[in-house]
Amino acid sequence: MGSLVLTTALTPLSAQAGHTFTLGAWYNFAEEDDNLPTDAYTKNGEFGNEAVIFYVDGNAEPGHGIWSYSAELRIGPGSFTDVDNNATGDEISLHKAWIGLDLNDSHKVIIGKSQVPFGWKTSNFWPGDMYQAGYGDQMDVGIKLQGRQNRFGYNLAYYPRDDWWSTSTDTTDDNRHWGSSDSYRKLNTIVADLNMEIAPKHTLGIALQTGELEDLTALRSAGLKIDNQKERDGEQSAGVLYYKGKFGNNFVNAEAIQTYRSLPSDLAQQDALEQDRETRRYALEIGRNSGNWTYYLDATWAQSQTDGNREGTISAYAPGIRYDYGPGWIYAEYLTQNGYIDRYGDIVDSDYEFNALYLSIDWYYSQSK
């Protein structure tokens, strides 16, 4: 979706040890259009999607501890949260909350809700992950080991669940691609990421993930419900090959993603779905920084490899511009796409067309000690 965002840091973040509190807010104007007979799913020149954001960050002084922490709480309709399937049932989302422990200068353990180390996430603000769709800007709950040695970097992570509560599936920011509170959610996800700096400011990497899918449907057997046991007869796996590079003030990111999901059997039966679902996806981002201005284009494509899915290749493009006005950023972004990727991870309705203009502004104030 699109939004007007406002960001500012009146007090610079401390480069030394300490604690930082940041108050943020954003607001958005959206002009949307699609080829459906009604406008129930579009916004016709509407202002809104406002949110208030609270950040806390900190770390121990060198030689006086190995800890660090980071948390972000969002409140409001622009929180990028899925109200029907999150942990609060409201427009309130804990986007991230983790504690870090430095093992040494090159290795760190992160515990809590943090970024899933899988490829890269887009630079745009409101169009979002587009057809990365569940494999871009994802925040899951678990433990992650990250490290770097010379030109090599790695991440190893285990996420018992994707959100805080037993039936919430809110991965914020890119929602509605990993089930729902009455269909399924992902469990016990293992992620491995290895990347190498092939030249200064140029990184090539590969990441793999695999995990279980828990059945949350009403068809789950009575015995399992009584014993409060989980029915985990679904599974998922994915791999990504990615590149991130900078050429002076220009930047380029590219990746290819292969996804597979075997849905829980009761869910597939209930919704008359093909149980095994596969897609191949591609993403490209190019941009340039020029003073206070940043120009960028995000492009994604997806193809279904699911038996019986006759939808063609779908595509999405989001050109944008961002201006750093001091306390925050002002964004102007356009999104055009055909088709979409649903909660089950497959391509739907390649004849669907959607176009949108988003104007956004954000603002931040930080206080450090």
Regions flagged by a language model, labelled:
Residues A25-D33, A51-I53, G58-P62, L73-S79, ...:
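Transmembrane beta-strands of outer-membrane beta-barrel pores
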Residues D351-K369:
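Outer-membrane beta-barrel "beta-signal"
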Residues M1-G18, S366-K369:
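Cleavable N-terminal export/targeting peptides
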